[in-house]
Swiss-Prot record:
Alphabetized UniProt keyword annotations: Cytoplasm, Methyltransferase, rRNA processing, S-adenosyl-L-methionine, Transferase
Residues where S-adenosyl-L-methionine binds: L76, G108, F127, G128, Q129, L130, T131, L132
Protein name: Ribosomal RNA large subunit methyltransferase H
Assembly mode: Homodimer.
Protein family according to the UniProt entry: Belongs to the RNA methyltransferase RlmH family.
Amino acid sequence: MKIKLVTVGKLKEKYLKEGIAEYSKRLSRFTKVEIIELADEKTPDKASPLENQQILSKEGERILSKVLDREFVIVLAIEGQQFPSEKFSKVIEDASVRGFSDITFIIGGSLGLSAKVKERANLLMSFGQLTLPHQLMRLVLMEQIYRAFMIQQGSPYHK
C-alpha cells in the first residue's frame, strides 16, 4: 500500500516540515508515503469571484494530473464527513481490502478545491468546522494516518 498526499502550496515552516518528516518516518514501517507539493496560484488581494474560480480551476487541473484512476481518493473538504479516529482507521483498511493499493489524500490551497477535484473523490472528509491553515492540516492529517495504522495494529498509541 502507498499513501500519497497531493497538496497545494509549498511548506515553509521548519516545525511543520519536521513534524511531517517524523510521521513519514513512523509510517514507513507500514506503508510508503509520497508527498506531492503543487504550486499555488497567486491570488490578488481583491480577487473577483470569477478570478477565484479561475484559480481553483488551474489548481484543480494540476491536482488531478497527479491522481491515477486506480487510486482511492480522499479529499479534505469542510463539507465532508467527519469520523472518529477508529472509523478513519477502518476507512483506510476497507480501501485496501477493496483492492485499492494506493490511497491519495488531497488538501487544497487557501481558496479550497474545485468542483472537479471534489467530484473525483471516493470520499469527502472533514476534520470539523474549524478553519485551519492548509499547511498545518498536512501535519494533522499525517498524525491521523499514523494513528489509523496504530489502531489497526492494536497499539496503545491510540489512548
